[in-house]
Design a protein with these regions (language model features):
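Short, surface-exposed beta-strand/loop "edge" segments at domain boundaries and coil↔beta transitions
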Residues: 10-13, 41-45, 55-57, 82-86, ...
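Short beta-strand-centered interaction patches in the first periplasmic/extracellular domains
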Residues: 63-84, 120-200
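Polar/acidic, low-complexity leader/linker segments enriched in S/T/G and N/D
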Residues: 1-16
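Extracytoplasmic/secreted envelope proteins and their assembly/folding machinery
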Residues: 100-104, 138-141, 202-203, 254
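A structural detector for beta-sheet-dominated domains
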Residues: 5-7, 24, 36-38, 52, ...
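Surface-exposed cap/loop segments at beta↔alpha junctions
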Residues: 37-122
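An acidic/polar, Gly/Ser/Thr-rich interaction patch typically located in mid-to-C-terminal regions
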Residues: 14-41, 150, 185-272
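A residue-level signal for beta-strand positions that form part of recognition/binding surfaces
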Residues: 1, 32, 55, 72-74, ...
Length: 272
């Protein structure tokens, strides 16, 4: 059973009769859902589907008629984290801080009317140098989160949170292990897919300058046949002003972060 809400969180009704539901969580980006059910007037774009403490916004509705004369709807959308896809970084943003604080600052400084708040920091460590102009807010924080192995989420309470998942693999002993097996009767079948079509592991990042004077750094050290190269134009990472110049070392660090973000987005894709 799912509750449907208006964009202002006014409850509109319940969905109890549906044919199928896929509710897909994502760690470092917005999750998505797909719902197939008989059509009703609650299923319109921008309405919100609540599933416990999680919620998603309806972004697509496809209506079809059946041979039996019924009307079915395929409803798709993304979790409320996707609201951040509606904003860009408005101007220049340059910070040297933890990945957590940088993501929180990107969101806080670019809400511009979005009905979201930002949770207090949890103190995750690891400082990075970051600079961007006019990037998409969701794309930027997703890249930082993936590079830093952090999760991002916006629940039904419309609070943006940065979190870190628990390692439940068999190779560790700190947390209870999660084991899926037919022997435990907690899985009926399985599917594994690996995709390397867009995979890159070495990136040449270009900063300020022209020709032989352009600032260039390389991120990644693969060699031979395993080496997969790409280029990123990072001219938006500047050298500051005459009054407040950015050191060459800091520019290199910012370019390195941009390269790490790129490689995080282009890593080998595995799904289970």
């Amino acid at each position: 059973m799912f509750t449907i809400y208006a964009p202002d969180l006014t409850p509109l009704g319940l969905i109890e009769n549906y044919r199928s539901m896929q509710w897909t969580r994502r760690y470092s980006k917005a999750g998505q859902f797909e719902l197939h059910l008989p059509m009703n007037n609650l299923l319109v774009p921008e309405n919100i589907v609540r599933n416990g403490n999680e919620a998603a916004v309806i972004e697509s509705v496809t209506i079809t008629s059946t041979m039996e004369g019924g009307i079915m709807a395929a409803v798709r959308g993304r979790f409320l984290t996707s609201y951040l896809d509606r904003r860009i970084i408005w101007g220049l943003m340059a910070m040297s801080d933890t990945a957590e604080n940088i993501m929180r600052s990107i969101v806080t400084n670019n809400l511009r009317g979005l009905p979201l708040t930002v949770a207090e920091p949890l103190g995750y460590t690891g400082t990075i140098d970051y600079q961007n102009s006019y990037g998409n807010v969701l794309a930027e924080i997703a890249a930082i989160a993936e590079m830093s192995e952090l999760g991002i989420a916006v629940g039904f309470d419309r609070v943006f949170r940065v979190y870190k998942g628990l390692d439940r693999t068999a190779s560790q002993s700190s947390n209870p292990r999660a084991v899926f097996s037919r022997n435990f009767e907690n899985v009926l079948g399985s599917e594994y897919a690996v995709e390397m079509l867009n995979h890159k592991n070495v990136v040449l990042v270009g900063g300020q300058g022209e020709g032989v004077d352009r600032m260039l750094i390389t991120v990644g050290n693969e060699t031979g046949l395993n080496r997969r190269e790409t280029f990123v134009d990072a001219r938006d990472i500047g050298n500051g002003t005459a009054e407040e110049p950015i050191s060459v070392a800091t520019q290199h660090a910012m370019l390195a972060v941009r390269g790490q973000q790129t490689l995080a987005e282009l890593k080998v894709s595995e799904s289970f």
